[in-house]
């Protein structure tokens, strides 16, 4: 029997579950097809949320064991209980996934547990998790299948010794030596977790810099900070092969520019070279769609070339970020419901949850220079911010880039304490086409780290008062 819906959402990650919830809110009959045992996709289950749980716990452990507590007059002798750390992480994740289930019930979203495949216009077949099969039809179908870790030729992931990001969240022991392949967001965050817990961490990167999408000055500052924390970086390095055994892994390395091969030993290796869209096996050909060479699906305003098929999140162009997927989900469903909806792709913030944190939105200096666009720069260091100084967290800065003529804010780049919670103000400013002067004239509470943003805006015009 064919079950009919207004909307079928394939995938229940941040894009998929938010699309399903918004459809329910708008009174549409909606089904969400997800084969995992829990909702939330990579982000909630094996990505954003568990990694943040370990980042937070490891930061506290490092503060207690590394002298930061003692400096404040708090004397403790911490002992690492890795099993409990992993348990609390899993409990937090379970609570979040149950929360999504509650929201599905609240908004009358039907969760069909299984794996979906398109079967022609308006039709979806589902291989149910319990072994059965279901046939669904809908006027509109939303593909929100997300992404998976990208493989590295010659380095086979087994999640025993050679790990992907999921495996790195489930280790039962602290590595003696963890080698991270890839100096991007995932590699640096997970590498910093295990460094704080006692591992020697070596980061290998093919390029001559870390975080290639990040503003150059910010990236260099982050690398210096992580180096001081004990992480080792080998840039311009190519991994050509890996051999794993019971006791560890042997890697063959070469200079990216060419040269002799050398070996590097580790007891664990994390492959974190990026992610690729999960679009294989979806039956795209049955509706006349094909992914590009990167596996991504083209769209105009989330609408694909196939009638009634929409695409959101990591399967589309742009940064693979949960909040970008959520934004696209809202726009997509509003349009399906016949409402006007737009998304500003120029104002999608990104955050690296290392210590110090990194946050940015908009254009960087390299991008502005490549476009030959004239701009002004305002900087303010956290070493001159009273709250950061009092908290002994004075590393980093905030940088604002504004148009040389109009003063419109073009980009904001932050590295320092708590900047993940501050970048939202910059996003609001840019959404309203604010000028640097607008930020400079806005009263900020004292003493807070957010004052550094105002001072950076003042510095665009050479008027910073506290530096």
Swiss-Prot record:
TM segment ranges: none
GO biological process terms held by the UniProt record: 2-oxoglutarate metabolic process; pyruvate metabolic process
GO CC terms in record: cytoplasm
SUPFAM superfamilies per UniProt: FAD/NAD(P)-binding domain, FAD/NAD-linked reductases, dimerisation (C-terminal) domain
Sequence positions that bind NAD(+): 182-186, 205, 239, 272-275
Keywords assigned: Cytoplasm, Disulfide bond, FAD, Flavoprotein, NAD, Oxidoreductase, Redox-active center
EC number, UniProt record: 1.8.1.4
Superkingdom to which the source organism belongs: Bacteria
A GO molecular-function descriptor: dihydrolipoyl dehydrogenase (NADH) activity
Co-factor requirement: FAD
Catalysed reactions, semicolon-separated: N(6)-[(R)-dihydrolipoyl]-L-lysyl-[protein] + NAD(+) = N(6)-[(R)-lipoyl]-L-lysyl-[protein] + NADH + H(+)
Cofactor remark from the record: Binds 1 FAD per subunit.
Keyword Disulfide bond: yes
Keyword GTP-binding applies: no
Residues reported to bind FAD: 34-43, 52, 116, 314, 322
Active site: 446
Cysteine disulfide links: 43-48
Pfam families per UniProt: Pyr_redox_2 (PF07992), Pyr_redox_dim (PF02852)
Cellular localisation: Cytoplasm
InterPro entries to which the protein is assigned, alphabetical: Class-I_Pyr_Nuc-Dis_Oxidored, FAD/NAD-bd_sf, FAD/NAD-binding_dom, FAD/NAD-linked_Rdtase_dimer_sf, Lipoamide_DH, Pyr_nuc-diS_OxRdtase, Pyr_nucl-diS_OxRdtase_dimer, Pyr_OxRdtase_I_AS
Family according to the record: Belongs to the class-I pyridine nucleotide-disulfide oxidoreductase family.
Function: LPD-3 may substitute for lipoamide dehydrogenase of the 2-oxoglutarate dehydrogenase and pyruvate multienzyme complexes when the latter is inactive or missing.
UniProt miscellaneous comment: The active site is a redox-active disulfide bond.
Quaternary structure annotation from Swiss-Prot or TrEMBL: Homodimer.
Protein name: Dihydrolipoyl dehydrogenase 3
Taxonomic lineage: Bacteria, Pseudomonadati, Pseudomonadota, Gammaproteobacteria, Pseudomonadales
Encoding gene (name): lpd3
């Amino acid at each position: 029997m064919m079950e009919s819906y207004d909307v079928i959402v394939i995938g229940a990650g941040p894009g998929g579950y938010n699309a399903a919830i918004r459809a329910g809110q708008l009174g549409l009959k909606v089904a969400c097809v997800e084969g995992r045992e829990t909702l939330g996709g990579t982000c909630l289950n094996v990505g954003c949320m568990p990694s943040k749980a370990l980042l937070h716990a490891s930061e506290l452990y490092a503060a207690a064991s590394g002298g930061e507590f003692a400096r404040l007059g708090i004397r403790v002798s911490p002992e690492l209980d890795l099993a409990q750390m992993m348990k609390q992480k899993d409990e937090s994740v379970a609570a979040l996934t149950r929360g999504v289930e509650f929201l599905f019930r609240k908004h009358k979203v039907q969760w069909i547990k299984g794996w979906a495949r398109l079967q022609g216009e308006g039709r979806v077949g589902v291989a149910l998790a319990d072994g059965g099969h279901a046939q669904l039809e809908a006027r509109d179908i939303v593909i929100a299948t997300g992404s998976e870790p990208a493989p590295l030729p010659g380095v086979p992931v087994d999640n025993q010794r050679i790990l992907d990001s999921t495996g790195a969240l489930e280790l039962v022991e602290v590595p003696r030596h963890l080698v991270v392949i890839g100096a991007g967001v995932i590699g640096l965050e997970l590498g910093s977790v295990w460094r704080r817990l006692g591992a020697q961490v070596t980061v290998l990167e093919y390029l001559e810099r870390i975080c290639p999408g990040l503003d150059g000055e910010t990236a260099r500052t982050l690398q210096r900070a992580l180096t001081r924390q004990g992480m080792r970086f080998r840039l311009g390095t190519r991994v050509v092969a890996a051999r794993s055994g019971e006791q560890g892994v042997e890697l063959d390395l070469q200079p990216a520019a060419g040269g002799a091969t050398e070996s590097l030993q580790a007891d664990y290796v994390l492959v974190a070279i990026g992610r690729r869209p999960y679009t294989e096996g979806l039956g795209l050909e049955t509706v006349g769609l094909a992914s590009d060479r990167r596996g991504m699906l083209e769209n105009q305003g989330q609408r694909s070339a196939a009638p009634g098929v929409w695409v959101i999140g990591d399967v589309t162009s742009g940064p693979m970020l949960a909040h970008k997927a959520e934004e696209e989900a809202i726009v997509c469903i509003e349009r399906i419901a016949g409402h006007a909806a737009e998304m500003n792709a120029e104002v999608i913030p990104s955050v690296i949850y290392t210590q110090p944190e990194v946050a940015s939105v908009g254009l960087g200096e390299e991008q502005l220079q490549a476009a030959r666009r004239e701009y002004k720069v305002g900087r303010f260091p956290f070493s001159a911010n009273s709250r950061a100084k009092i908290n002994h967290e004075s590393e980093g800065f905030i940088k604002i880039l504004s148009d040389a003529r109009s003063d419109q804010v073009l980009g904001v780049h932050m590295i320092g304490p708590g900047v993940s919670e501050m970048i939202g103000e910059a996003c609001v400013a840019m959404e309203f086409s604010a000028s640097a002067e607008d930020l400079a004239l806005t009263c900020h509470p004292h003493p807070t780290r957010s004052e550094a943003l105002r001072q950076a805006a003042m510095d665009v015009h050479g008027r910073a008062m506290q530096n």
